[in-house]
């Protein structure tokens, strides 16, 4: 009903070899972190939260980013706030944080104090393998301005989601996910349209309304097919039902009503 990680299934699959579990706060809706933390403590695995959708979401009074051993956020162009491109990792372990800092810029270690004082400012050392993942000052500046508007963005997105929820309640072939938006920073608005995904998307496209599918299941992509050893019937079924409706702060009230009107029009023709 909410497409979050099935913790009953996780519990069945934990073995002594389990090193980490990666819950996804899908659409910005937090997973059951209390239960997952208990499982982590009992079975000695790390929790790496995929919070790409959930910047600003709250779970039981605390911001997402407060729970797992590591939490990953995304600030790409379509997220709740953007830096143009980029993201952030929030960690509880200072040693891991330092390793990530070095890896984000080619494994280079440069003492910040010496740079500030211009002592041997030319000197650096490569201490580990690394990547070019550091953010530019321009991207960071964009992000800081966006951050100052976060509450405004979240409020607008919640309002749109609530308009959709109210309009689509009790429909026969279109089913919104069951999400309480009071503490959620909504990234996407998803409906399930069993057996009519393609028809629904085509209908809205003809009306000038763009939609998406978030996401095509990983195991059906060419790269990952060879690693799929078991059937995943629920995943297979769900990705062919879900449709993403427009949700962003550029939508006017009239735009929202246009989406609602046309979704209801499809419901009448399809029921």
Describe each region flagged by the PLM.
Residues 6-8, 12, 20-24, 29, ...:
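PLP-dependent aminotransferase class I/II
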Residues 51, 74-77, 92, 146, ...:
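A secondary-structure boundary/capping signal
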């Amino acid at each position: 009903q909410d497409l979050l990680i099935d913790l009953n299934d996780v519990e069945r699959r934990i073995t002594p070899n389990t090193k980490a579990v990666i819950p996804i706060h899908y659409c910005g809706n937090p997973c059951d972190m209390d239960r997952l933390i208990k499982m982590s403590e009992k079975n000695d695995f790390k929790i790496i939260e995929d919070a790409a959708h959930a910047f600003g979401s709250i779970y039981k009074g605390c911001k997402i980013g407060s729970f797992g051993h590591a939490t990953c956020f995304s600030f790409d162009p379509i997220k709740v706030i953007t830096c143009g491109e980029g993201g952030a990792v929030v960690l509880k372990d200072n040693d891991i944080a330092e390793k990530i800092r070095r890896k984000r810029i080619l494994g280079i270690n440069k003492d910040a104090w010496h740079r500030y004082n211009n002592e041997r400012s030319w000197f650096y050392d490569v201490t580990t393998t690394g990547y070019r993942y550091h953010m530019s000052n321009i991207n960071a500046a964009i992000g800081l301005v966006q951050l100052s508007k976060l509450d405004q963005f979240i409020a607008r997105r919640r309002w749109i989601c609530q308009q959709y929820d109210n309009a689509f309640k009790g429909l026969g072939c279109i089913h919104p996910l069951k999400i309480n938006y009071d503490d959620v920073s909504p990234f996407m608005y998803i409906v399930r349209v069993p057996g009519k995904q393609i028809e629904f998307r085509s209908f809205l496209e003809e009306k000038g309304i763009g939609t998406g599918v978030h996401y095509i299941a990983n195991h059906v992509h060419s790269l990952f097919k060879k690693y799929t050893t078991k059937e995943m019937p629920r995943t297979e079924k769900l990705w062919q039902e879900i449709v993403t409706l427009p949700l962003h702060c550029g939508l006017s009230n009239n735009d929202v009503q246009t989406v609602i009107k046309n979704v209801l029009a499809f419901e009448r023709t399809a029921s």
